[in-house]
Amino acid sequence: MKVTLIAILTCAAVLVLHTTAAEELEESQLMEVGMPDTELAAVDEERLFECSVSCEIEKEGNKDCKKKKCKGGWKCKFNMCVKV
């Protein structure tokens, strides 16, 4: 009887520890709503700048603005890179 009780208590303790660890992992992987993703914002600003500069340089040379700078799901529109 003692062995069965010890086994049940051990199993319960392991279950509690496992559940707690899983909850902590889930919380650490969630993003907080309202926090800006600064890395994505920096990439967006960089693409906007590259596209604007590229278009302006090509327009000054009396050529049509060729949209070469925006790649990877982005396109140049109104001298700005926009997500497609």
Curated annotation (Swiss-Prot):
Please report which protein family the annotation says this sequence is part of.
Answer: Belongs to the neurotoxin 12 (Hwtx-2) family. 02 (Hwtx-2) subfamily.
The function of this protein is:
Postsynaptic neurotoxin.
Alphabetical UniProt keywords: Disulfide bond, Neurotoxin, Postsynaptic neurotoxin, Secreted, Signal, Toxin
Range of residues in the leader sequence: 1-22
Q: Which residue windows are transmembrane per the record?
A: none
Under Gene Ontology molecular function, one entry of this record is: toxin activity
| Alphabetized InterPro entries for the sequence | Hwtx-2-like
Taxonomic classification: Eukaryota, Metazoa, Ecdysozoa, Arthropoda, Chelicerata
Question: Which organs or tissues contain this protein?
Answer: Expressed by the venom gland.
- Here the disulfide bonds are 51-65, 55-76, 70-81
SUPFAM superfamilies for the chain: omega toxin-like
Q: What Pfam families does UniProt report for this protein, alphabetically? A: Toxin_20
Q: Which species is the source of this protein?
A: Cyriopagopus hainanus
Q: Mind telling me what this protein is named?
A: U4-theraphotoxin-Hhn1a
Which residues form the propeptide in this entry? 23-47
Q: Which GO terms describe its cellular component?
A: extracellular region; host cell postsynaptic membrane
Q: Where in the cell is it found?
A: Secreted
* Keyword Secreted among record annotations: yes
